[in-house]
Amino acid sequence: RQSGSILHGDFFFRGLRTNGTNFYVNNVPGVFTQFNTPLYPIESLEVLSGPNVGIYGTGVQYETTNPGGIISVKTKVAPDERVFDYTQTVSGRGLFGEYLDYGERFGDKKEWGVRITTENLNGSTSVKGTKINGQGIFANIDHTTDHVKDNLFIGYRNLDIQGGLRWFILDSGVTKLPAVPKGSNDYSFDGMVKSTHGWLMTYNHDQEFNEHWDGFFNFGMQRNNLDRNVMANGGSGYVLKEDGTLTVTAKPGATPQEYYYWQVGTTAHYNTGDVKHDITLSYNQAWRNRKSAYNNGSLVNIGTGDLYTGIHQTLAAPTKFDTRWNNKTRIKSYSLVDYMTYEKWNAVLGVHKHEAVSNAYKYKNATSSEVTG
């Protein structure tokens, strides 16, 4: 887990940074974003590495730092015994949190389950100059019979973070690293903010036809409105000189987006001698439509600073912008894979094919044109 900032739920994976865009939630990619990831509705998180991850359903990503692996997330489901917990937390410099966790099973055979998790978070973090205001509610509803399992996960979240940027980029002329500063230093400027609200859902259907054949269907969607994003250097971080000095530049932005995904497939279970085979054939499609800011000007110099005394702001951060379509991307893929097990040995053999179309939008005189690639 990468430390230093609460803005993104970043992980380092094989030396490369990844975030929510590479998370699979209940086998559905793309419903989380690169912004701060909600953890309270998550039951487990598993890192899947290696070339075999390419045979899973393919989502539409908008981050280029794909590390050759995925983070597989399973959401909380209703346990066999009823749970009803209310928790209050205090941390940082007065960051107050409230969490509700309710789960229960219903029906003659406890075939229905409901799990609801909520968050209310407000206050200042342990990092100076960083404040959080966040609310969210997620629900997981599952239904299980002898041969069929359905699971619906749906939720809404609002999150506003003021300050918090602690990313630095070395200037091209730097030949040695600056001296290490105090970890408590504040590098926020007035008007630094990242704010988003939106909802997501996933649906999974698993069907057992007989002892040799299974079928599955996965669906997911997301509506996320990152409607305020005022960060240093357009969000990429401060550029450091060799002596630790920096220039504070900023411009406002936003990236509202919508995302859809579906996958259908079947799995066969057979043995050849002592080798067990689980052979899966699947097909999926995914769409991501994304807007970006315009009429937001270029980067504005609003002050100076350094690693040791913080930020010295001389101008107010810019705030004016509008949004319009930036790109629309669609991808479809086919996968065939054989998971083979022999005693303590495991092997994976698979083939995968995908096709993608991306339409970028150029604007001139208030009209748009598509560029397909």
Give the location of each predicted region.
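Acidic, small-polar-rich N-terminal luminal/periplasmic segments of exported/outer-membrane proteins
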Residues: 1-80
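Short sequence motifs at beta-strands and strand-loop junctions characteristic
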Residues: 5, 91-94, 129-133, 191-197, ...
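Hydrophobic, lipid-facing positions within transmembrane beta-strands of outer-membrane proteins
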Residues: 9, 69, 82, 96-100, ...
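Outer-membrane beta-barrel translocator/receptor signature
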Residues: 40-43, 52-137, 145-150, 199
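Outer-membrane beta-barrel proteins
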Residues: 75-77, 104-108, 122, 141-147, ...
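Repeated loop/turn-to-beta-strand initiation elements of outer-membrane beta-barrel proteins
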Residues: 79-83, 110-114, 147-152, 212-215, ...
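Acidic/polar loop-and-plug regions of large Gram-negative outer-membrane beta-barrel proteins
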Residues: 125, 138-208, 223-257, 301-321
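Face-selective signature of the C-terminal outer-membrane beta-barrel domain
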Residues: 201-224, 246-363, 371-373
